[in-house]
């Protein structure tokens, strides 16, 4: 099954800016790998299908594991090891974003001390690398953002912190005029999720904003000074696109669907294939044939 996205034409480029190339890459997110619920088998199926499509690289939108946030070192290390072994099936360059479930031991119920050397984002950094960064590929600029900020009371908020905002502003300012930008972030910057999942948002007892980036307007203001073609997002497990100010905010469905219990609000388990063709972007959502072995329990 594949669901196609809209085609957006980029503006013309100056002589000083190399023409953007043509290639495909895959964006997948929210694997939530675990030894339960056939999750490793599902990731195996998914990664083999991605590899068979032969994209030039893949980008992972966060929530690699289930879970590191509220568990001890043994469980967190085990699910990270499981993810890293399974990821080898991709056999291609891979760029990671951090998700809330990837942060280690922050919830008090984990029993992990804040002085633990792997506490917070350190476990992710040791295994996956930096939490925010950028790179160029065939005259496109890719930006990976960190939307997960643990709080002093051992909870978390979806936010892009001040140091990162300064970095992003400088990073985009240094680009050649007209160079197309594609951003990746775990928690959405722009989404319609609160409209069709209103009861889930309103009914949740949350001290902090954990569904969408709390200071998204600050990020969007920086984006206005660059040619941001698309933002690839995860976290909600629902496939959607919102077009805002000539940027596509594409939220991909999850590899795990409804946390390995079937489709999530109509979106089956899958990933997003992004096609870039000389400054034009299109995308489609692909499923990979996973069938849950348990009845759905989560909304």
Show where each model-derived region lies.
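N-terminal export leaders
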Residues: 1-8
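N-terminal active-site segment of His-dependent metallophosphoesterases
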Residues: 10-76
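Extended active-site neighborhood of metal-dependent phosphoesterases/phosphodiesterases
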Residues: 17, 70-180, 206-209, 214, ...
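Active-site glycine-centered loops adjacent to acidic/histidine catalytic or metal-binding residues
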Residues: 30, 62-63, 99-100, 186, ...
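Short acidic, glycine-rich surface-loop motifs adjacent to enzyme active sites
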Residues: 65, 175-194
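Active-site His/acidic residue clusters
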Residues: 151, 189-204
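Histidine-centered catalytic micro-motifs
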Residues: 183-189, 229-239
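Acidic, His/Gly-rich catalytic cores of divalent-metal-dependent hydrolytic chemistry
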Residues: 278-299
């Amino acid at each position: 099954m594949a669901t196609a996205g809209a085609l957006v034409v980029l503006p013309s480029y100056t002589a000083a800016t190399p023409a953007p190339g043509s290639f495909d890459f895959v964006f997948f997110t929210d694997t939530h790998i675990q030894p339960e619920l056939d999750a490793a088998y599902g990731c195996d199926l998914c990664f083999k299908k991605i590899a068979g499509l032969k994209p030039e690289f893949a980008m992972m939108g966060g929530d690699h594991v289930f879970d590191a946030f509220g568990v001890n070192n043994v469980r967190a290390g085990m699910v990270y090891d499981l993810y890293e072994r399974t990821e080898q099936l991709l056999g291609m360059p891979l760029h990671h974003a951090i998700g809330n479930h990837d942060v280690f031991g922050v919830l008090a119920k984990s029993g992990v001390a804040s002085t633990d050397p792997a506490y917070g984002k350190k476990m992710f950094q040791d295994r996956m690398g930096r939490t925010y960064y950028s790179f160029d590929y065939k005259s496109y600029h890719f930006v990976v953002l960190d939307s997960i900020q643990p709080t002093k009371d051992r909870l978390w908020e979806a936010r892009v912190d001040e140091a990162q905002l300064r970095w992003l502003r400088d990073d985009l300012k240094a680009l050649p005029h007209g160079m197309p930008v594609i951003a990746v972030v775990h928690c959405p910057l722009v989404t319609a999720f609160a409209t069709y999942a209103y009861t889930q948002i309103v009914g949740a007892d949350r001290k902090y904003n954990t569904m969408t980036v709390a200071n998204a307007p600050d990020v969007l203001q920086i984006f206005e000074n660059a040619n941001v073609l698309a933002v690839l997002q995860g976290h909600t497990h629902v496939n959607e696109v919102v077009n805002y100010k000539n940027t596509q905010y594409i939220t991909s469905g999850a590899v795990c669907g409804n946390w390995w219990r079937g489709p999530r609000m109509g979106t089956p388990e899958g990933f997003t294939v992004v096609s870039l063709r000389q400054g034009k972007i299109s995308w489609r959502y692909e499923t990979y044939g996973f069938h849950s072995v348990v009845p759905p329990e989560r909304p």
